[in-house]
Amino acid sequence: MLGSGILHGTTFQKKLVAGALICCLTTHVDAGVVLLYHHVDEGTPAITSITPDQFNRHMDIIVAEGFTVLPLDELVKRSMDASSGPEKSDEKIVAITFDDAYRSIYTTAFPNLQARGWPFTIFVATRLIEEKNPYYLTWAQLTEMSTHGATIANHTDSHTHMIRRLDAEMADHWKGRMRRELLTAKGLLVDHGLDSNLFAYPYGEYDEETLNLVGDLGMIGFGQQSGAIGPHSNPLLLPRYPLAGVYVGEAAFREKLRSLPLPVLHPQIEPMVSDNFKPPLELSFITNTLNLSRLTCYGPGGLMALSETSSTNVLATPAEEVSVGRTRYNCTLPKGNRFYWFSQLWIRKQSDGSWYHEP
């Protein structure tokens, strides 16, 4: 793949993939889809919110589409199983996740999910809980939900931008600081009986060093890039569909539920861009049986230019430069009434080299 660098798999990543293949040989499914919510509220910022009515409608659609809601760790194991043959299952599976532990998860989402008997995962930045911030959950609420199907997982201690270095910060100091972020959060979760090896990158940001750190600590990592999980997914950078603001429409939600992992080879591309602000994306497919003429990719400026460099390789080039902040390319390929789906993150600093501000 092309880009400013390639993210190489860690030893942990390879062991995790092997373990997933061994443990679940009788439960292979086509894909596992993970949903990502933040606020379930009408009075919070639209960019991270879904209304209670919209959330309930999403849950009803899950039922109507015949999906089984699984705990997140089980969904990962089953969807990354590469077995085939008579044991293969056609079961459609989905997992529900929330980032940041906002209070509306307890007051609005939890009663809905509890009534349905569905498991879910909350990724918690523990310092916000420790500080008793009124906008966030309490340890008592997290513990209560954990007894009713919730997995409480790691989202760092302070919800920091993991890829950002302090002024004049050396690599070893940065690594130590990030280890403390992860281990402090883990320690607090363990102290409350809420241990998990699941981790979500704050803001969905990552680079090679953060992925390696998460792998070295034996965690499974989740981003905020779209797509479904399959046998070739990177267990340190699993996709989730962010659902908020303008991205909660019912038709689009059904398409995301039905989506399949685009069968391309990993590793992922290093997302940070520093000189070429129109970074190309090379997709290397694991098979030459797909009709790649139906592949569509969107990026800055809309539809991306595609060129087949071989029977299994496609190069996608954006019409415009990626903007300052976080940008994603999204590629889809139809399969019947479903879509293969792949998303790639890009990160660009401001022109003076400083970091962008969050909205």
Go through each PLM region and give its residues.
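N-terminal secretory signal peptides that target proteins for export/translocation
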Residues: 1-12
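Cleavable N-terminal signal peptides
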Residues: 18-19, 29
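N-terminal pre-catalytic segment of deacetylase/amide-hydrolase enzymes
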Residues: 29-93, 259-268, 317, 338-359
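Metal-dependent polysaccharide deacetylase catalytic core of the NodB/CE4 family, i.e.
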Residues: 32-46, 65, 90-94, 102-104, ...
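Short, electropositive alpha-helical surface patch
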Residues: 206-221
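Short, compositionally biased P/S/T/A/G/V-rich stretches that sit at domain boundaries
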Residues: 243-277
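Beta-strand-enriched, solvent-exposed domains that form extended recognition/catalytic surfaces
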Residues: 263-359
